[in-house]
Amino acid sequence: SQEGAGMLREKGIPARSLKGGYTGWLFQQMQKESKKGDGEETENEAMEQRRKDIELSIRKKFHKQLFTRFARGINDYELVKPGDKIAVCISGGKDSMLMAKLFQELKRHNKFPFELVFLVMDPGYNEANRAVIEHNAKLLGIPITVFETEIFDAVYNVEKSPCYLCARMRRGYLYSKAKEL
């Protein structure tokens, strides 16, 4: 609460209220981010600069730890061949977003052409979760294709292993969608 955070600050403890929970805080950050700039810089310009900074860190700071190993694995096991169409499925988490960026980087430097498609399956997210995924994809320059399902509704009343069933159904939908492409 605001009151609790104020009491902690009075005692010299840095604190703030997370009114609306983590999602509320995250939306505040997204709004602040869209207002950043020197007055002349637009939201798109600010996002573009942030995207470039992130991509530069992948290329420079994390090149050896991430990209070199990723590219070596792709090449050693011949996972991508000329003319392939690859669907990168994005959950919205850091792992799938990073995987998408690594594939974009691979395509940028690869010796042969291949296609990339970035899929996001909405199994019944609330508006806030979906907005965060879309915002982060836009920020990172990942052109996502979103398709909706009602998986969350389908497993809502399942008592035994709903997480297992949900995961299987999500994979099934993703495989089907990837085959359509």
Report residues per predicted region.
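Rhodanese-like catalytic fold shared by cysteine-dependent sulfurtransferases
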Residues: 1-48
